[in-house]
């Protein structure tokens, strides 16, 4: 019996619950929210869709952390979403307080769970959660790289008019304006993307525009929605991570993880390719970055560190 608890029953939380149900990733799903009515209402609504879609999963909604006991996976989406004109970093003070409460609830009731954080600003929130909760770093990860990579793949597929599943691509670094798309490691139908640039299928200038659109991918959606931020693609990305852990898939996925010397970086969470299996983060893959990529990656790391310093001033417990 596999149990997944979702902390936050907003747009991402509700979508996560529905996806987990339709894909039967777990046997039980608990939707937790401080607004218990929203959690209970969504849980009941999704449960009522099970006979239509033909899945067999138990759903419940709660505002009591005791109900997440014995969870195999916990996905955190609790927090305030962005509004137009806001960066992910603008959410820092509000969401830091929320993450601290969530960390206490999980530490007390489900300390053995594999925890996936989706709350923004992502890299600092997952670092703060790990620090507040004391859970082992290999069991605490952030969802960012899968989402950023999926945006990069989509924009390339639209530009090159090829199916998105034919594109292999990866984005590293922090989940923000300094993220690092990696065209050099990108393949289209097995062919290096940079070969297509040489052949004139896509210009270097157009490729850079796609890189920038990837960095702005979340903001573009926030601008359209006006109230709220992306939720379908973030939820799908979170489910992929949960599946890799529960099914011991040993899958290579770009995730925000705790770096301890890899890529020349220590004591920081940032997006890199990792293997996820039954032990959580089982291996951090170190790909050979060139000088330009290294410079961009370190610039992204510096941005994460600067935000971490700001967070530490808001809550001195993070400096301990």
From Swiss-Prot:
GO MF entries: L-lactate dehydrogenase activity; L-malate dehydrogenase (NAD+) activity
Query: Recorded E.C. number(s)?
Result: 1.1.1.37
EC primary class: oxidoreductase
**Entry annotated with the keyword Hydrolase:** no
Span of the signal peptide: none
Catalytic site residues? 175
Which positions bind substrate? 82, 88, 120, 151
A Gene Ontology annotation in the biological process aspect, one of them, is: tricarboxylic acid cycle
Q: Which InterPro entries match?
A: L-lactate/malate_DH, Lactate/malate_DH_C, Lactate/malate_DH_N, Lactate_DH/Glyco_Ohase_4_C, Malate_DH_type3, NAD(P)-bd_dom_sf
**Keyword terms:** NAD, Oxidoreductase, Tricarboxylic acid cycle
Q: Which domain of life is it from?
A: Bacteria
Similarity comment: family membership: Belongs to the LDH/MDH superfamily. MDH type 3 family.
Name of the protein: Malate dehydrogenase
Which organism was this protein described from? Pelagibacter ubique (strain HTCC1062)
Q: What is the lineage of its organism?
A: Bacteria, Pseudomonadati, Pseudomonadota, Alphaproteobacteria, Candidatus Pelagibacterales
